[in-house]
Amino acid sequence: WGTSGAPGRTTLAVGIATALSAHASTLLVDADTANPTIAHLLGFPVHASGLSSLARTASRGPITPADTLGASVMRSKNLHVITGLVTPHRWREVSKPGIESIVGALRLSARYSVIDVASTCLEKASRGASRDDAALGVLERADRLVIVARGDIVGINRLSFLARWWREQERDIPVEVIVNRVSTAAIGPHPVPSLQAAIGAFMPDCIFHVVPEDEGVGRASLRGKALGENGARCDASDALQAIVEQWVPTL
């Protein structure tokens, strides 16, 4: 999850799942109903949606691990991917109860699950169906939340609004922030102290991590590779790998 704009939620979600798959079975799920892009990023066919398939299964009854794996695409021995909607205008295919059933099924299907969701409207939810339903359903059922923000003035400002909204939800789960695309050009000559001061003003107890601006990210995307996958190593992937290694003992 993360701020509006393009902070790099999908890129980091894919990289996190790839790093986790080195340790145990992992499912990567594209539940971004606004801009589903994992299939595009990894070079998968985009004419069928694993998420829609699972949502239809959920409407008929409980989802089994066999259903989950059957709706996924194998990326590597330990990494399976459930691709997102074929097109964003079909967001109604994934209801809030449906995504909650999917999240529950994921826990029985792999050791780790990484779910990429869209940024949400930071206003009170409407009574009817909403494009935010999938993201809200995931946020309500998640065991851990990773918030992605872009490392510039606009990104940190957006993070402050998101942090206030999240506090109002009163969810008691571990939350960490990844500040992505950090550079001295955008933050100043001392990025980490500057970020500590800025984020500490509205998230004083927050653990945050930094992933640097890196041209290697674009090169990996052009090749259909996840960060850190088969020759797609760069400074950004090394930073993300280090973050995941910190998490693994507590997952």
Stretch-by-stretch model annotation:
Residues 78-128, 135:
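Phosphate-binding/switch loop-helix module in NTP-utilizing enzymes
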Residues 222-251:
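NTP-binding/hydrolysis catalytic cores, primarily Walker-type P-loop NTPases
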Residues 119-123, 142-160, 186-188:
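Conserved Switch II/interswitch segment of TRAFAC-class P-loop GTPases
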Residues 20-81, 103, 208:
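Phosphate-binding loop that captures ATP/GTP phosphates
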Residues 108, 128-152:
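Inter-motif core of Ras-like GTPase G domains
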Residues 181-183, 189-228:
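Beta-strand-loop-alpha "switch" segments that mediate conformational coupling across diverse proteins
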Residues 135-136, 159-172:
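Conserved C-terminal guanine-recognition region of P-loop GTPase G domains, centered on the G4
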Residues 1-29:
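Walker A (P-loop) phosphate-binding motif
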